[in-house]
Amino acid sequence: MDWVWTWGGKCFGYIDGEDLWTYDGKHIGKIDDKEIYDCEGMYIGEIMNKNRLITHCGKKSWRRFSFTPYGRRVSYVPMANYLGYAMYAGYEDFPPPESFTS
């Protein structure tokens, strides 16, 4: 289990195997290489700098496999937020965990 933060520095949750989870236990996505896809197969972002989540604006129309999300897990107290990084051109911050509904 590896904790991850948005590019802006907000604690998002963790990666367990090929799955992305919010800190409050929602299964958000599957990881294909470094790209993250939601349960409908839509690109939602990628992993950069080992533990940061960011979204490439040019990839928002990309699709991969769909999947059935796992049930909710136990919630964790979120890790401390970090200072955000400067945004790269053509990217935007990964959505916060609260924006994903189950």
Go through the PLM ranges and name each one.
Residues 1-2, 42-102:
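Long terminal segments
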Residues 1-14:
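Short, compositionally biased leader-like segments
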Residues 5-7, 23, 64:
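Intrinsic disorder/low-complexity segments enriched in polar/charged and small flexible residues
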